[in-house]
């Protein structure tokens, strides 16, 4: 995974070097996205492997422990929410050269890999909600100018631990005073359905105002 992005937050680079996975850190409510992450030049579809509630102690909750856990799970990478409890495991399943997969194809793709969630009923239900949300969200994102989206793989609406997303009601957002990061792991999938420059500039992620964010998800 270090072939795709480096991790610099709180010394995670030393843990990520040479590994096949990466740790996306949101312990302070924000992903480590300002520096150290390389833009993904190829398009990858990430599939949720498992959602698990794990009680990290302040000592255990560090990049090394998380990287070890991801390694044991044989995950390519994982995200966790600011709640410090729910981990959303994702696995790189496919690389697509086409940005035109429709929601039905994506649905079929996820269904093919749904067996990885059978150990968790909650995860299986959560996948259903992901599919439902994607079907409506992909259409919206196709209408956006690609420059309005960040090019970083870790930018996302916070999902996973949020019960609202499991109920398919609304997206969660991460509050940073008056600014909001467009934060959703859906973007990791959605980016395969829109036109994105093949070599995006290594700039800071896009910041959106609350009104701008609401306009995107309303």
Residue ranges and their predicted role:
Residues 1-72:
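Basic, amphipathic N-terminal segments that precede the first structured/catalytic domain
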Residues 69, 95-99, 163-167:
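Short acidic, S/G/P-rich loop/turn micro-motifs used as interaction or catalytic elements
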Residues 70-80, 130:
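Catalytic centers of nucleases
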Residues 72, 85-87, 126:
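Negatively charged, Asp/Glu-rich surface segments that serve as flexible interaction/assembly modules
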Residues 77-79, 86-95:
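Conserved catalytic cores of phosphodiester-cleaving nucleases, focusing on short active-site segments
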Residues 94-124:
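A solvent-exposed, charged loop/short amphipathic helix patch at secondary-structure junctions
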Residues 121-128, 138-173:
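Nucleic-acid nuclease catalytic cores
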Residues 156-218:
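Short, low-complexity, polybasic intrinsically disordered segments
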